[in-house]
């Protein structure tokens, strides 16, 4: 850390965190705009929009920003938007499969930026379909193991376990409930994700997000050096404005994850 004060280091970290937060907000706003464009601006009749708004609120996106995004997406005002979804495919170190989902108003810019982010960091672009066939589209409802509810003037912390979720969602026929550490992921057919989400809500349980995602058929284990290389690719992709989601089949062992955390 030669030549850097503690304040300068802290300031740099805060700037990096603020930049990531800004990019997260931009992605969440895009989700809202696209959902409103495809299904209308009324969340009560557009479950995809409802869930996009819920996810944005969970990430503390201001209500005014959400309202403006709904209006833009539904064609109100001069700044109405029109994005297209494009999926790119790549391989990282150790053969890790990577799916890159873009929401863009400029296809040429998106593909150029993605290609640079992948190839300059040691990855290779893949032919269409060669990577996507290794994944399945699934509905995913994420539920935190602890959540807060308002009880009168007090805030009460509640806990939820796998048995409660299984009982709450059984009629919605989820395929699996996966323990992901601080959250449970309730996996379903994409067509059932709204039913699962409503079942969770109907049981009085809070949820973090409900969306269609890509889940790998198998995972690829990596060691420390390959994990470092992969993170460089993923970080470069996450920095791109057109990239909305990145999915991979990487399996990072706990000891490798701990070593990476120490390096940050």
From Swiss-Prot:
It comes from Cutibacterium acnes (strain DSM 16379 / KPA171202) (Propionibacterium acnes). It comes from the Bacteria. PANTHER family: TRANSCRIPTIONAL REGULATORY PROTEIN YEBC-RELATED (PTHR12532:SF6), TRANSLATIONAL ACTIVATOR OF CYTOCHROME C OXIDASE 1 (PTHR12532). HAMAP family: Transcrip_reg_TACO1. One of its GO terms (biological process) is regulation of DNA-templated transcription. Belongs to the TACO1 family. It is found in: Cytoplasm. This is Probable transcriptional regulatory protein PPA1157. GO terms for molecular function: DNA binding. Keywords: Cytoplasm, DNA-binding, Transcription, Transcription regulation. It holds the Pfam family Transcrip_reg. Its main location: cytoplasm. GO terms for cellular component: cytosol. InterPro entries: Integrase-like_N, TACO1_YebC-like_2nd/3rd_dom, TACO1_YebC_N, Transcrip_reg_TACO1-like, Transcrip_reg_TACO1-like_dom3, YebC-like.
């Amino acid at each position: 850390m030669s030549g850097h004060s503690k304040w300068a280091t802290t300031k740099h970290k805060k700037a990096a965190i603020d930049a990531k937060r800004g990019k997260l907000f931009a992605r969440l706003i895009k989700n809202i705009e696209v959902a409103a464009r495809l299904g209308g601006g009324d969340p009560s009749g557009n479950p995809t929009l409802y869930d996009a708004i819920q996810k944005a609120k969970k990430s503390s996106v201001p209500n005014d920003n959400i309202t403006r995004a709904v209006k833009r997406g539904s064609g109100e005002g001069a700044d109405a938007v029109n994005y297209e979804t494009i999926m790119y495919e790549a391989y990282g170190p150790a053969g890790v499969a990577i799916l890159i989902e873009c929401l863009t108003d400029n296809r040429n810019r998106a593909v150029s930026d993605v290609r640079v982010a992948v190839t300059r960091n040691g990855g290779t672009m893949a032919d269409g379909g060669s990577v996507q066939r290794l994944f399945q589209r699934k509905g995913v409802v994420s539920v935190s193991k602890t959540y807060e509810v308002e009880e009168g003037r007090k805030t009460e912390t509640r806990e939820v376990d796998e048995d409660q979720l299984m009982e709450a969602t059984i009629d919605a026929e989820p395929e699996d409930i996966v323990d992901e550490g601080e959250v449970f992921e309730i996996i379903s057919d994409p067509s059932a994700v709204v039913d699962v989400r409503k079942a969770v809500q109907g049981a009085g349980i809070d949820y973090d997000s409900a969306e269609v995602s890509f889940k790998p058929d198998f995972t690829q284990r990596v060691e420390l050096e390959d994990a470092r290389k992969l993170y460089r690719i993923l970080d470069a992709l996450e920095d791109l404005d057109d990239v909305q989601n990145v999915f991979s089949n990487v399996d990072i062992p706990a000891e490798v994850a701990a070593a990476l955390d120490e390096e940050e």
